[in-house]
Structure formats: C-alpha cells, structure tokens
Amino acid sequence: MCPGGYVVSAASERGGVVTNGMSLSDRAGANANSGLLANVFPDDLPGDDVLAGVELQRRCERAAFAAGGGAYVAPAQLVGDFLAGTPSSAGGRVAPTYPRSVAWGSVEKCLPDYIVGTLRDALPRMGRQLHGFDVADAVLTGVETRSSSPVRVTRGADGQSVGVAGLWPVGEGAGYAGGIMSAATDGIMAARKVVEALGGGVAE
C-alpha cells in the first residue's frame, strides 16, 4: 500500500499494459494506492505447461493494452461501476495518476472471471475494515500482473535449487514471495541456509 502514491507503468513487453504502485519519499501525492491481489491456483492456468502462468499473465496484459486503445494507455473503472458490472464513462472525485493516461471502460474484460469474482467479493469486505477502500468513485487501473512470479524455481529442504547445487532461489522472482515483507523474510531464511551450508552456525 502506497500512501501519497502513484500508479505507474511497469510494462516490459511490447503490446502489454502492466501497472504498479509507488510513493516518493515525501509521500505527498493526492491519492493512496494499493494493489488488489487474487489467488491463482494451478488448476486455473491455461494448460499444464511450466510457463502456463506466464501465458495467463500475458493474456491479461495484452487485454489491458487493447482495452486502453493502444499507446500503453491503461484501462480504468470506478469501483462502484466495477461492483455493479457497469463500464465507466468518466472519473469522479479521485483523479487517476497513471502517467500515460487512462481509458475509462471495464477492467473486468482484462481478467478471468474467477479473478473478477474474487475482487468483487473482496472489495466490500476491505471497505468494512478500511473505511473508504471501496468508495464508489475510487479508481481501478489495470492490470497489475507482476506482483508475484508466474513460475516457481523448486528448492529442496536445504534451500538450494533441486537442479543446481549452490543456487538458492529466493524471493519474488523465484516464486517464493509476493511483496516487500515476504521477500525480506524469505531472504533471511535463505541467508541462514547459506550459512549452514558453508559450515557456519546460525544464532537464533
């Protein structure tokens, strides 16, 4: 969650739109922004290929590119319209911060139905816990598809890759974390495994 933050472009492939969030050090932006995440299980993926998660990611990113009309404009929808299943035609009190502009419409067209359903269920629940989180004219800007790795590098009980000795897959890129805190925690655990493998003791 980024207080006083901005939604930024994070695309790395031609023809795909990817969003992310950040704050500058003064956290003085007009908005707060937060990524909305949904579980994706192996049975949800389009096929059994090891890169099926990457394919799902690309489908969403390409759909967002098309929904934005090209030029890496991001699709956007008001929360109230999203919950009602209605495309948005204009913004409200909350101004979007995505730097390449937004195209008002329907972000749900960029996502699989099971993710849309999860988000529609979660937003009102979040609003009950965090007042204003589901306010009707809050802005959904899509899509954030890079919060977690779509693949996982398998590691053994010693923390090393099962295929390459001496390699410790760690954090988000290896598929073991989905954010700053979980990545830091995984890094600490991996560091302990490295010290143990090198014959050192680990203080508790």
For the regions a protein language model found, what residue spans apply to each?
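Short C-terminal domain-edge/linker segments immediately following a structured domain
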Residues: A66-A71, A184, L198-V202
